[in-house]
Amino acid sequence: MIKVLFVCHGNICRSPMAEFILKDMARRAGVGQNFEVASAAVSCEELGNPVYPPARRELAKHGISCSGKTARQVTPADYAHYDRIYYMDRSNARYLARMLPADPEKIRPLLDRDVADPWYTGDFTQTYEDLAEGCRKILEEF
């Protein structure tokens, strides 16, 4: 079982989108049972809130549901539990460096560039495409 945690600022846009994109891709590839996938925030600003409506709509356009997902914050227990922790941008990396042990094999960027935060850009389609690119790479790696 490969355990993957996606992390972004608030756990209402990018990281839950990545969580459900990877779950969907793994299921469609017939390897869903080989993955445990979750997401979390580096901040506590959105704790308990559902996925942001435009992010839900973008996932729904691709036939993906994120029903029931609520924001939670990353914890030290996540470091012990997950095999890989993928962050979305350099700001997330700085927060994680204060929260978890340094471990570049386990904690790494999803892409070789920042995944723009659609909370600010409003471009949920581009975010979806970037996240799908990163999730495809994860599937290829494992």
Language-model segments: residues:
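Phosphate-binding/catalytic loops
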Residues: D78, R84, M88-F142
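Conserved active-site segments centered on acidic
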Residues: M1-Y79, F142
